[in-house]
Amino acid sequence: MSGEMFGDEVDIKARLRAAEVMYKKFHRLISDVIKGRPPKLEIPKRTLSNTIFDPERGILVIGEEKLEREFLNVGESRRFMQTLLMASIIYQSLIENEYPTIRDLYYKGKHTIVYRDYSGRKREENTWDEQKESDSVIQDIEVYTGLFREDMLILSKEKGKVVGNMRIRSGGDVIDLSKLGHGAYAIEPTPDLIEFLDVDAEFVLVVEKDAVFQQLHRAGFWKKYKALLVTGSGQPDRATRRFVRRLHEELKLPVYIITDSDPYGWYIYSVYKVGSITLSYESERLATPKAKFLGVQMTDIFGYRGKKPYLSEAERKKFMIKATDKDIKRAKELLNYSWIGKNRRWNVEIRLFLKHLVKLEIEAIASKGLKFFAYQYIPEKIETGDWID
């Protein structure tokens, strides 16, 4: 290592482990060159066609298909170069005691290479043009090394929040999540480095929107019902998904999720539950297969087979929003996903949506009154088991 390492013991151990794994994985390329073999990388394909739903584990997993990136293959040489460049930057950050963000890595690696082609003409090539290109390279390194970017101490913007009767240790400090006033604890980008000390909660409630999270927080929902209240502020980041998984897996707390009643809200639930297609290689640690969809359900709005709707006809007219062509297309896509389309309850929900072609935001339920939302709608659905599994 270069220089004396700093940080708490947990960080130092993570740094040492990641640096060792990266060194061993990429040192193989040097061995190939020494032995006269063209260096190449074999990386699992991160595509929809190589994403499989494992019904036994209830999560999306990456398949066995791999792609080869060879240095001497003209079609693959640029991506090969990008992968080695990014790996070297990450490794250097590890041994230099740095905590780069994904944006930092983009800028550190972005430059123009000037060279001459076979005919002697001068050429210029950027290492990468946009951040989404460098982000994709980081994901390739994750699947190649088996390390996640959090393991490599790569930071990202904090997005998720949590509040509740729980104490944790982070960076050597003990934090009481019940004593943050009207604020909440921002879930750090390296949630595996958080130590759970003690908790007094009976379940986890994840709400899609930050505004709804704040309403429930100020209403004292988590105090009254002994809950840990979490939000991913829309599409959840990896840290929030991992934190929720840990709460369920390590503390054995049931997880309930509330999103808008539309195809995009349903997909957010799916991401928490089974994982995402783009990050299927991370589902084992990010997904929470037993997470339950509490609402807002289409059957909450229209009723179904004896279930009474929570909204009157007048309230439906007031709060319902007409579905867009994009919403309709997304709903049909969801039905094609086996983990949704083969689920009887989800078939009912989505076909009700396609029948009425309307959607509802969480705030519409809350508009009946915060007390109704916090003290009747949510607890009633939990008590009666009115969720989709």
UniProtKB/Swiss-Prot annotation:
The protein's required cofactors: Mg(2+)
Lineage: superkingdom: Archaea
Signal listed as a keyword: no
Enzymatic reactions: ATP-dependent breakage, passage and rejoining of double-stranded DNA
Gene Ontology CC annotation, any one: chromosome
Family label: Belongs to the TOP6A family.
Subunit relationships: Homodimer. Heterotetramer of two Top6A and two Top6B chains.
Name of the featured protein: Type 2 DNA topoisomerase 6 subunit A
Species per Swiss-Prot/TrEMBL record: Aeropyrum pernix (strain ATCC 700893 / DSM 11879 / JCM 9820 / NBRC 100138 / K1)
Gene designation per UniProt: top6A
